[in-house]
Amino acid sequence: MSSKIMPIDPIAQKTPVAEDPAAIDEDARLRDDIRLLGRILGDTVRDQEGEGVFDVVERIRQTSIRFHRDNDKPARSELEAILDGLSTPDTVRIVRAFSYFSHLANIAEDQNNIRQMRALSGTPRPGSVVGTLAHARAVGISAQELRRFFAHALVSPVLTAHPTEVRRKSTMDREMEVAGLLDRRERLQMTAEEVAQHEEQLRRAVLTLWQTNMLRRTKLTVLDEVKNGLSFYDHSFLREVPRLHGLLEDRLNDDDGRDEELASFLRMGSWIGGDRDGNPFVTAEVMRGALRLQSTRALRFYLDELHALGSELSIAAHLADVSDDLRLLAERSPDTSPHRSGEPYRLAVSGIYARLAATAHKLKFDDIRAPVGAAEPYADPQEFKADLDVLHRSLIANQASVIARGRLRQLRRAVDCFGFHLASLDMRQNSAVHERTMTELIDAAMPGKSYMAMNEEARIALLAGELRSTRPLASPFVKYGEETLGELAVFRTAAEAHAAFGHTVISQCIISMCKGVSDMLEVVLLLKEVGLVDHAGRSAINVVPLFETIEDLQASAGIMDRLLSLHDYRRLVDSRGGVQEVMLGYSDSNKDGGFVTSGWELYKAEIELVKVFEHHGVRLRLFHGRGGSVGRGGGPSYDAILAQPGGAVNGQIRITEQGEIITSKYSNAEVGRNNLEILAAATLEASLLMPRQSAPRAEYLDAMEQLSSFAFKAYRGLVYETEGFEDYFWASTVITEIATLNIGSRPASRKKTHKIEDLRAIPWVFSWAQCRLMLPGWYGFGSAVEAFVKEHPDKGMAFLQELYREWPFFRTLLSNMDMVLAKSSIAIASRYAELVPDEQLRQAIFGRIRAEWHGSIQALLDIMQQDRLLQSNPRLERSIRNRFPYLDPLNHVQVELLKEHRSHAIDEKVLRGIQLTINGISAGLRNSG
């Protein structure tokens, strides 16, 4: 806010840490940006809301600092008195002020990260393509070997609509405007007049942000979510995916002096519009709409690029030679303009544009720039790219390679990566829905049989027999239930999409809560019904099991072994290039067994799956269903990929990106490029370089098994075995209020109960983040370490310290926990505990949580041999510490509003205040879901 409120240096409120001068200089520039934005926001608040609101914000902030730093009881009483004295409208104004400061501080921090990326650009470092290629060279891997690796590689970020981004798109658009202005300030040398004009622009942007609704008034539809997801293609993917390929291609060609094109390996995926698991609003019609929106975005981008390319390629025939193929392409163009008669490249581009426009019309897209004349539509993206290749070869052959390496190169690569469909849309549904659908189909087709009553082996035998049968299972003369008709309609829509866009438009059919071989065969049979699996044993779609619970992870290798032993299924895998994808669920396994056990069972499942797939001679591709928060598998992607067991990556990886994580990673082109580079570099390193390192020692695995067992017992003991825990959870968190936020199209619970088992993982994790406990990201660790050291009194702690130093998996596990605990606050959490009306229950459960929190922090510090949390990550430590003075007040206000909301009749203004605090706290935490 103004110089009176916001510019205080929160870093100075803690004991200073000795750091290198470069880091201090980084901090100074970051603080300059925060001060500037804070001053502008403060002036805006004073102008718009008055001096009184302005002063109260400062009092709350200062008192909150005392409470957080010292757990000061007088500060707590003073804070409660200030908040009690506020009217609801003033409370809302104050919440908005603190929330927007968190948003603006995030922008400044992002800009600082971009500054660091630019400073390090081109230098070999972990997570960079340059660093990874240098590492590969150092261990004797040639450029040609790397080209062969990428020819069979797949790196696929998959965007999902999991509802963890609480900001409206309008808010994000305004914030991107502020970010763009900060970037301009960074890049340009301005005169005094330009500096003043620039600040005026910032003031306009911040004022507009202040006067923009922070909350959505209506619930998002699925197609709204699709449109939001597509905006990141404009910001990042459509340009940065081709650029990353170009960077790698150039580096490899520089290494060995060749001039070879690199195979495209980075492919985008999406769940938005195809994920039906628990979302009744994703129908066949919605899926059709999602595919249309995706394709429209891709074709419009290509048409715009062709229009620009036509302007650029003003090459005259009498000044430069052209190839025969190019001349033929120009002659076929419907462009009859005399102005371009001697410009063969422009004529060729006009013809290509006309054919692509005809393709768009064939796919029933409107609102495109009119072509110069009628033309034949392209049959597929390969035909379109073949014409672009003619331009490329002609330029190369006639000494114009520098032109070929510009916009044309980027466009050719984009077509190769995005096709006409933009991203492969995954279909996902719960295995229970497939089971009910198959039951209805089989019971109608085979009177007297009861599919639901059959055991697993009987089901496998029946489904395998049906797979070999040439007759369809569904009948047009049977009146099926609504659910079955809906599922059949979705599969038929998938078949139609394949006919319209090609086989890459929908490549995966994912089975949530997969518990057996029959769950897989049911989906194969549904694909066969619509022609996506044929009688010759060819499948147009990968059937992907999703193993989510601890029990299912433990059973996963056995299920896949049985499945790959079935001749009828193995034929389908062979038809897909001998690759079988398996998805692992981080969220539900965490909710089921806790952070430590979830991480360990996922690791063990991967080890066992690698063995099974090697035995069957099938290539394993793992799809990691990670969330944004550590409690849902989040954390740095580079570390997570390198921490995988040997053989688990093997050149292919898919990974979910969702909600606030999509925004933070891909709303800025440079940041997007960096994150794509990290995924590519980590996949290469984990596949080619890490296998050369030795596997973890047996005693490491034994120790982790013991830790997991102890942690599982502690976690389950609290969450599932403590009487009254569900009541405590629902009373001490904002779980009820989260459902009112309109942040996604999907319901928060699978069933209308208060059972933890029925709650989705996102609201579970989100709720614990809001009350600043982050319990899913650490609970059980302290008890596990205490029990382990007690069993190994002589060398237990020293051995765990060795594990941390030597084993990437354990190091990554603890590093993520370090970050989570640094964001937590037991003092603030104690205020949420007071919302529980039963004092005995409150003291019993919060007492256990508090003891485990202290024990987990101490265990973590002992193993990492640190004096404080995040000691080994000073940049993140500073970042989190900077946020507390503006984040903590939102928690205090939220508690007071929750008290009022739950003790009186529903007041929309109070509820709106709670929703605003949820928004602001999420912004301050950055990865809360």
Swiss-Prot record:
It is an enzyme of class 4 (lyase). Its cofactor is Mg(2+). It holds the Pfam family PEPcase. It catalyses: oxaloacetate + phosphate = phosphoenolpyruvate + hydrogencarbonate. One of its GO terms (molecular function) is magnesium ion binding. The active site is at H162, K591. Its EC number is 4.1.1.31. GO terms for biological process: carbon fixation; oxaloacetate metabolic process; tricarboxylic acid cycle. Keywords: Carbon dioxide fixation, Lyase, Magnesium. GO terms for cellular component: cytosol. Forms oxaloacetate, a four-carbon dicarboxylic acid source for the tricarboxylic acid cycle. Belongs to the PEPCase type 1 family. This is Phosphoenolpyruvate carboxylase.
